[in-house]
Amino acid sequence: MSKVVVVYHSGYGHTQRMAQSVAQGADAELLAIDADGNLPEGGWDMLAAADAIIMGSPTYMGSASWQFKKFADASSKPWYSRAWADKVFAGFTNSASLNGDKLSTLHYFFTLAMQHSGVWVGSNVMPSNTKAAQRNDPNFLGSFAGAMAQSYVKKTNLDWSLEI
């Protein structure tokens, strides 16, 4: 049986909810990156033993969170020894906006996987782009590179008024 690890960072809990669903569907172990961008003890060993690594992060300012990027930069050690070569990779992300530049985050994950000589697996779920489609339909956002979700926020403190 294959061993799958879902490594993710979650800023406000939305990505954690996605990670839990992904892990349940893939019969995978969860590996959370903490608020300082670090893995828990034994985390690197979990990834070394995995056959597949599924990466998740919120999309902030058009890319993965800095905590995920810190993890990615630290993965240069397994890169140097080619420890993740031929592993299967996939990814998921979310943002508050309908678009939110989530594809940029998935491209970031893809590039990281390719640098590790991995094999990328996208989504085979057809987009729900019919007139009858609803926002909760599978693949409403139409992504083939990986899973995308829109995470609603309750309130924003941003003031978009512009005084000239």
Question: Positions of the model-derived regions?
Answer:
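Short glycine/serine/threonine-biased micro-segments
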Residues: G11, A50, I54, Y60, ...
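Glycine-rich phosphate/pyrophosphate-binding loop and the adjoining helix
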Residues: E41-G43, N124-I164
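Soluble or luminal CAZymes and related metallo-dependent hydrolases
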Residues: Q67, D101, T105, E163-I164
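N-terminal beta1-alpha1-beta2 submodule of the flavodoxin-like/Rossmannoid cofactor-binding fold
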Residues: M1-W84, T156-L162
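Short, glycine-/small-residue-rich phosphate/pyrophosphate-handling segment
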Residues: V88-F140
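Generic structural "secondary-structure junction" signal
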Residues: G62-S63, S81, D86, N94, ...
